Amino acid sequence: MSKQTFTTTFAGKPLVVEVGQVAKQANGATVVRYGDSTVLTAAVMSKKMATGDFFPLQVNYEEKMYAAGKFPGGFMKREGRPSTDATLTARLIDRPIRPMFAEGFRNEVQVINTVLSYDENASAPVAAMFGSSLALSISDIPFNGPIAGVQVGYIDGEFIINPDKEQMEASLLELTVAGSKEAINMVESGAKELSEDIMLEALLKGHQAIQELIAFQEQIVAVVGKEKAEVELLQVDADLQADIVAKYNAQLQKAVQVEEKKAREAATEAVKEMVKAEYEERYAEDENLATIMRDVAEILEQMEHAEVRRLITEDKIRPDGRKIDEIRPLDAVVDFLPKVHGSGLFTRGQTQALSVLTLAPMGETQIIDGLAPEYKKRFLHHYNFPQYSVGETGRYGAAGRREIGHGALGERALEQVLPSLEEFPYAIRLVAEVLESNGSSSQASICAGTLALMAGGVPIKAPVAGIAMGLISDGTNYTVLTDIQGLEDHFGDMDFKVAGTREGITALQMDIKIAGITPQILEEALAQAKKARFEILDVIEATIAEPRPELAPTAPKIDTIKIDVDKIKVVIGKGGETIDKIIAETGVKIDIDDEGNVSIYSSDQAAIDRTKEIIAGLVREAKVGEVYHAKVIRIEKFGAFVNLFDKTDALVHISEIAWTRTANVSDVLEVGEDVDVKVIKIDEKGRVDASMKALIPRPPKPEKKEEKHD
């Protein structure tokens, strides 16, 4: 295929698609140019079905530093593992694409997005999502798209599609919404306590904008799209399925309705193992035993899936016996740990998260050096999910994509209520340790984070709580579930996480397993989530009503002083010599910003006070008219040099020592003597003249005697 170019304008920026010039051996490839951002997307598919019980889709988002005209950091000067932003963007693209493949599709698919040039005012992630859908759509890979995504901002009551950098900084909303022509199928958002009505309108505005991008893709597919390949889907033997269902469905139904998680898992597993043992023995001599046993496992999974969904939609019975809109039992605890700067333990049913707060000087902020201009990140929220939380063994190591994603969601939810840097000049880190999990652990980490922040004395604007909503739909009828547990998440159609305060929403995240959901479902889910959020906030506020007025004794204390910008170099000294000396003497940590704000951190208030005294002395300037208690440091014929304070000296001219004539300075003063002086002049070079006699009343002039004349 020769190169073909397709052009349109979207959200005020040129959108150009090139097909047929590069990566021609991939099943499908596109170059998408949005503004000055350029993304190459290549989609490939394996020729055979993969083993395993899941669809092996891999989406990568690769940031090449040359795209922004930068050298990679580090010793190797080469791109390494994906950044957190790259990982989150890959997840953002994966989530709306995954539901668009057929049930039973098991061929491995890889979608690789490479950022070739970067424009901070034209979203490369949005371009990559567009390119991913288009590369799959024009390929022979059986993808049931297209999909597209946009960013939505909210400024002065107006919604903005794909806002630029300046607009996004001013926006009360940072929303990414994706979907098909028919419905929304992915949401990711942070918001500054916006109402459910505004959030719903933003979602609908985003979906409306998506239609334009989908229509553009359809035009391109009509010209260059390939015929879709015929691939084998995972299908079970119908006779085998009928046999197993007839014999064992009643037993599995009974096991599924055991309310307690571990007991239910044991009961269902016992039924499954019994069935597998019977059919393994029956077909032991069959050459297709492996395929038969794979089908048996798949049939049992489908039976459990169908029963859980039937109970909810028809009987309105949940696996643990709760009502459709009922939250599991809640518990909130603060000060779970000694010594740390703050801690909170939040439990919702069999899901439990411990959040631990650490405060540090601003020098500990994380420096983010990616494609965007380098910046410092003050607030970090890390999420850990050990395997023991679900009673299993497993891999331990660096955080995976899921842990990074859940940590970022909690970070967005909580950062909206943090105090400003001026109010609270600390770097803040929260670590969420999931101790038990039966669904919604990311939302438990948000609730635990709120407890830890308030217990640690961080003056947040309001408590934040999170809840996960679910959906069971047969295409005609649906049921929205409040506070989904693991089984409902696994067999359900939606995981819709909503976090916020009593005033409004601070974060949203939605993943679905069906092609999309309607505005009616979204509205109902948001309304149920608000009710549940308020119930959780009641429990949090009953435990700790507001942030404590004082930090923990172990937290670093802080004091801030302001110095003139031109005095920064005086405090730092040559090569950092002066500031290092201060730190060595007092044991504090010192941060100085470009505006002359000096922050001093220590657990010892006396050390802070001493540091302030030293710095004040370094930056202090003599002022005309002020009086100083000085020390004579050198005597010359023409006067005496005195030290006013620290490194500031002044000259007391011989004529300024006394009102009467001074013949010799050394007759009046000696080195080391303390004297009071008044500054009378500072010249343009900063040289200071002082006077002793200015502090002494001037003696009256002697009266002239009248001469007598005879």
Curated annotation (Swiss-Prot):
A Gene Ontology biological process term: RNA processing
Residue positions binding Mg(2+): D489, D495
Localisation: Cytoplasm
Region (Disordered): 691-710
CDD domains registered for this protein in UniProt: KH-I_PNPase (cd02393), RNase_PH_PNPase_1 (cd11363), RNase_PH_PNPase_2 (cd11364)
Domain KH per the UniProt entry, residue ranges: 556-615
Domain S1 motif: 625-693
Protein name, UniProt field: Polyribonucleotide nucleotidyltransferase
Gene that this polypeptide is encoded by: pnp
